[in-house]
Regions:
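Rossmann-like AdoMet
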Residues: 1-72, 76-127, 146
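Class I S-adenosyl-L-methionine
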Residues: 124-265
Length: 265
């Protein structure tokens, strides 16, 4: 199932059963090999989140001598603006990996005051010596849906149902399993973040020096795969409204799923 990026979340879905705070996963690699950490931060600007003292990780502290920041999927450029404004001359180069021409145009307009430092890339570089940042990137990557039904695991897919004239779910048996065992034998739906996991593996392989910070909505694995979270975390957002049905208004909704920070780390 493909998802689209969404950058204005606010409402909690019915799956939360509490709070799903904004978290950042930090992969620090001052010198290889990289060490992995997860940190939880409170309200404030993204620049403040990424300068989270007491955990030994900050954009300022991780910047190399060439002062390079690499942002993956910069949205409207808000995070880039805040970092460039907060860090000033410490940033010599701010590279943005962005494939959308429309978003590039928005970013260029917002960041025109920093134009000598900013450049755009079409793909992740083969070798990275930089501070890598991402705001609500991982939760917008495609996921697989795994459905335990009658004690048998299935992968959920989408078919066209001509009898009802619309798309519908179809479950097929699979050997795939969630990364942790789900207690109980009740029906259970969850996401498998295959693309986000592959992205992080690629990033870890290419990050020669620096750090990676990701701000997102998510949980550690024991909360993400809690037996009571039996409907998963997949949500749709459109016109400031949220629902859990990606098969309606197809193409008009942003589709997201919370992040398993344990798996990402």
């Amino acid at each position: 199932m493909a998802t689209q990026s969404h950058r204005s979340k606010g409402a909690q879905g019915p799956y939360d059963g509490g709070t799903a705070g904004i978290q950042s996963a930090a992969c620090t690699a001052s010198v290889p090999p990289a060490a992995i950490a997860s940190i939880c931060v409170g309200p404030g600007t993204w620049a403040e989140h990424l300068d989270y003292h007491g955990k030994g990780v900050s954009v300022q502290g991780a910047l190399g001598p060439d002062g390079t920041v690499l942002e993956f999927g910069a949205g409207d450029g808000s995070l880039a603006f805040q970092l460039l404004d907060a860090l000033g001359d410490q940033v010599e180069r701010y590279a943005i990996v962005e494939v959308s021409a429309h978003l590039r145009e928005m970013q260029a307009k917002r960041l025109q005051g920093f134009s000598p430092k900013v450049q755009w890339l079409d793909a992740l570089p083969e070798a990275i010596e930089a501070v890598v940042v991402g705001n609500e990137v991982l939760d917008a990557m495609p996921v697989k849906l795994l459905h335990r039904m009658n004690q048998t695991w299935h992968e959920r897919g989408v078919i066209w149902a001509p009898d009802i004239g619309q798309y519908a779910w179809q479950d097929r048996p699979t050997d795939a399993r969630p990364p942790v065992a789900i207690e109980g034998d009740h029906d259970y739906l969850c996401e498998s973040p295959v693309q986000a996991s592959a992205f992080m593996r690629t990033l870890a392989e290419r990050l020669r020096r620096g750090a990676a910070f990701f701000i997102d909505y998510g949980f550690p694995a024991h909360e993400f795969y809690h037996p009571q979270r039996h409907m998963g975390t997949l949500m749709c957002h459109h016109l400031h409204r949220s629902d859990a049905d990606p098969l309606t208004d197809i193409g008009a909704k942003d589709i997201t799923a919370h992040v398993d920070f344990t798996g990402i780390a």
